[in-house]
Amino acid sequence: ISGIVLTHSENAIVTDSASSATAYSTGRKTNNGALGLDKDNKILENLTERIHEYGYVSSLISTSEITHATPAAFASHVDLRWKTDEISKDMMESNVMTILGGGRHFFLPEEMGGKREDGLDLLQEVKSKHTLLTQKRELSGFALDNRDKVIGLFADEHLRDIEKPDNHSFEPTSSEMLDFAINRSLKFQEMGCKGFFIMVEGSQVDWAGHANNINYLKREMQDFDEAVQNALDYAIQSQDTLVIVTADHETGGLLIEPAAPADYTAPEVKFSFNT
C-alpha cells in the first residue's frame, strides 16, 4: 500500500517536526513547535496513551536525543519543542515502557555538565525509579523478563556523532535498538499484554539534508534501511504486524539524476541539493 501525506501544519504551509509528529501521534494537526497539544494548547491524547488503556505496550527509538521533537510527540505535552526540561520529565513519567536514544545531557543539570536549567538531576531519578542503560552491550545483557520501564541514554547528545567516531562502538544502531524493543515487547506479550507499538525514527536523515552532506545522508539512510528490513522480517514471521514507513517532511531538496544527462541508461548517478 502506498499513499500521500499532507505535511502542512495548522498554522503554516511548511511544517516542523513537532507539529508533524503530533499529527502522527494524535491524529490532529497543530501549530509548529507544539507537542501533544492542539492549536489552542489543549492536551491531545496520543497513541501510546490510548493503546495503554487497552493493554498494549509501547517503545520509542530515536537516533537523536530522546527529547527531540518526534519521539517527544508520542510521550509529552508541551507548547514548545525547546522545553526539554519539561519534555524529559514527561517522557520519564509516561507509560512508554522502552525509550532508547541519546540525550543524557538533558537529564543532568548545568552544574553537572548537563543542559537542564531547572537544576534537577533527572538521571538519578531515572536510576532510582526505572532501569537506565548507557552502553550498547547492556542491550544484549538485559533480562527480558524485567518489567521495569527502560530508558536507554547512549550518548550525551545524539547517537553516532560524525565528529566523535571513537564513541560509535558504544552506541547502538537503529536496528539493534529495534531488535531489543521487539524482543522485549514479545516478552511483555508472554506476560499478558495484548500487543505492542514501536516508533523508530531515523532522526539524522533530516540533519544530513540540512547540512547538504551526501555521505552523512547515505550513512543515515543505510542505518534506517536496516531497521526497516528488521521490521519487515519480523512482520513476515509474525503474520499479524503492520509496518508503516513514512516521513514527516523533506529536507535539503535532494536531486538524484543521471551522471550523463544525455544517456538515461547509464548506471552512474549524481546527487545535488537544492535548499
Predicted regions and their residues:
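Surface-exposed loop and membrane-interface regions of Gram-negative outer-membrane beta-barrel proteins
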Residues: 13-20, 30-39
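Mobile, glycine-rich extracellular loop/lid and propeptide segments
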Residues: 24-25, 29-30, 38, 44-45, ...
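A post-motif C-terminal structural segment
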Residues: 1-22, 68-275
